[in-house]
Amino acid sequence: MTKTVDLDWKNLGFSYIKTDCRYISYYKDGEWDNGALVEDNVLHISEASTAIHYGQQAFEGLKAYRCKDGSINLFRPDQNAARFARSCTRLLMPEFPQERFVEAIKEVVRANEHWIPPYGTGGSLYIRPLM
């Protein structure tokens, strides 16, 4: 089993804790690029972003948790992918492919595996995809 970071897992609360990696993909000329894991936790967006001016954004929230046998589970990521796609469609934003959404989540979880609390602590790694 992968070693976890040294935190008081039973008293985490729900505040932001920076992890190692996140996934970023850009949409340009009608298509999504391949996306990649990045270590930078600062979002670099245009001053003309509709998220800033009009609040146009979509987000989801899901959890990764460790099982008794040490394996890691995601709670219904396919349903998160479908909701995210519906949100994007309703907001007239380009839909991120649902299969890629789930794969990107898995990639982020693997890269941040040591941030997932040990089994029995009641904690989980909260993942917040956004567009």
Walk through the language-model features, giving the residues of each.
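Conserved alpha/beta cores of soluble small-molecule-handling proteins
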Residues: 1-131
